[in-house]
């Protein structure tokens, strides 16, 4: 069964219909049922609970969460895919126990009402909001961001009710199961990768703002500069040699680390590519790209890391949400440079949603130290 076109999925969404979206096999490898929150009814909630069986959640933009005064469920998110749960909610009025389909639909409508204020909701409750990353699936390839993106593109409030699809025996539904589910219920099915691809054809969260030659101790590179429309700041890409989409390209996506890149601090734990080592390796091969991403770490966070240099790396590694943001930004830059296949300077990693950027990791090259 072929996946439906994103254009057709958006049109169904515009008509108030549910759709199925599947993520990458190297991520959750799951499918979620999605519905624009503006179209949520008791019947829709009942169908989701009965047929999909997963946890019914409400995706909201960061701005929307702030307007409702919704705090994160926990101060430090340790979940594998950084799913950003806020505190659970209930409508202040018009509900009884809060768990019925009608009550949950009422809570959703209260949360997405154009004039909604914090007093319209109480906490905790039976609806679980999820805070989407700014930039949507171009920043993080998750169902949370996909829900907000689809609703926005269909002309609704950028918010969706979503639920994971489970099999009768309680196991997670995978692609073959999801295809049968979609056929049984007459629901269109698509992929987050295709949604990323669709958005990239019309919009980006980064924009190229400059290009020039840059002489370095490792040779002359072409320096490309990019403005980040979401996070602010400037990212750079240093390119040597001729880049062709069909040829595997040596690539390092590097987040600026003042402690390591400027003063040469050495961390406890497995060695990884420094900025200078990556530039030297590219120069030795005569062809490759080093993407240098701005570090949005606060001054306070940087100061707190200094005493931890001798501690295990897990004590100061970046959050999963930050990593996904960096992957999305770096992938957009690589796509802009015309790269299709990567020889990745770094340990083997699985990046969610890379297929949506038409990128394929052919090889991972660990640091030789």
Curated annotation (Swiss-Prot):
Looking at the UniProt record for this protein, which Gene Ontology cellular component terms does it annotate, in alphabetical order? cytosol
* Keywords tagged on the record: Lyase, Magnesium, Manganese, Metal-binding, Riboflavin biosynthesis
Give cofactor(s), names only: Mg(2+); Mn(2+)
Spell out the residues of the site Essential for catalytic activity: 126, 164
Q: Where does Mg(2+) 2 bind?
A: 28, 143
- Quote the record's cofactor note: Binds 2 divalent metal cations per subunit. Magnesium or manganese.
Q: Kindly state a single biological-process term from the GO annotations of this entry.
A: riboflavin biosynthetic process
Q: Where is this region: DHBP synthase?
A: 1-201
Instruction: Name the catalysed reactions.
Output: D-ribulose 5-phosphate = (2S)-2-hydroxy-3-oxobutyl phosphate + formate + H(+)
- Which amino acids does the record list as binding Mg(2+) 1? 28
> Which cystines does this chain contain?
none
Q: In which pathway does it act?
A: Cofactor biosynthesis; riboflavin biosynthesis; 2-hydroxy-3-oxobutyl phosphate from D-ribulose 5-phosphate: step 1/1
Stretch list, region GTP cyclohydrolase II-like: 202-369
The superkingdom listed in its UniProt entry is Bacteria
Query: Which family is it part of?
Result: In the N-terminal section; belongs to the DHBP synthase family.
Purpose: Catalyzes the conversion of D-ribulose 5-phosphate to formate and 3,4-dihydroxy-2-butanone 4-phosphate.
Q: What is this protein called?
A: 3,4-dihydroxy-2-butanone 4-phosphate synthase
Which organism encodes this protein? Pseudomonas syringae pv. tomato (strain ATCC BAA-871 / DC3000)
- This protein's encoding gene: ribB
